[in-house]
Regions:
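Cys/His-enriched microdomains
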Residues: 71, 87, 105
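Short cysteine-rich clusters marking metal-coordination/redox-active sites
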Residues: 73-76, 89-92
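Short, flexible, mixed-charge glycine/proline-rich loop motifs
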Residues: 61-68, 78-83
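Short functional micro-motifs and their immediate structural scaffolds
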Residues: 81, 97-98
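Short hydrophobic/aromatic patches at helix-to-coil boundaries
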Residues: 109-113
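Long, charged N-terminal interaction/targeting segments
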Residues: 1-59
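Solvent-exposed beta-strand sheet faces enriched in polar/charged residues
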Residues: 29-32, 63-65, 108
Length: 113
């Protein structure tokens, strides 16, 4: 259910950006999502279909690009991109990791008319 408020924010950001460019219509909203963002693109699309009615984003399509999980090992200092299902340092095997990224949910770009 949290996708409703997230979608409202995505819509607000997109409408402001489109208006600033003088665009009349938003065709595509491209998102960047970290593996721990908790955002389900299909849910965002469903809410956008409802929230976007009567706006420049009516009929817009969501495209999401998944970002990698980046960590730094607290033991050996190595930085790496890892799979969220295998959380350990690829260099030394330590489980003591500091997350550098992975919670992102950003509007990367718009395709507009």
């Amino acid at each position: 259910m949290h996708e409703l408020s997230i979608t409202q924010n995505i819509l607000d950001i997109s409408l402001r950006a489109a208006a600033a460019q003088g665009a009349k219509r938003i065709r595509v909203i491209r998102l960047e999502l970290g593996p721990f963002s908790g955002v389900v693109p299909e849910c965002v699309q469903m809410y956008l279909d409802v929230l976007g009615k009567g706006t420049a984003a009516e009929g817009a399509r969501i495209e999401a690009r998944r970002l990698p999980l980046k960590v730094e090992c607290r033991d050996c200092g190595a930085s790496a991109e890892i799979d969220r299902r295998h959380i350990q340092c690829p260099a030394c095997g330590s489980l003591r990791l500091k997350r550098l990224s992975g919670r992102e949910c950003t509007v990367e770009s718009l395709e507009v008319d």
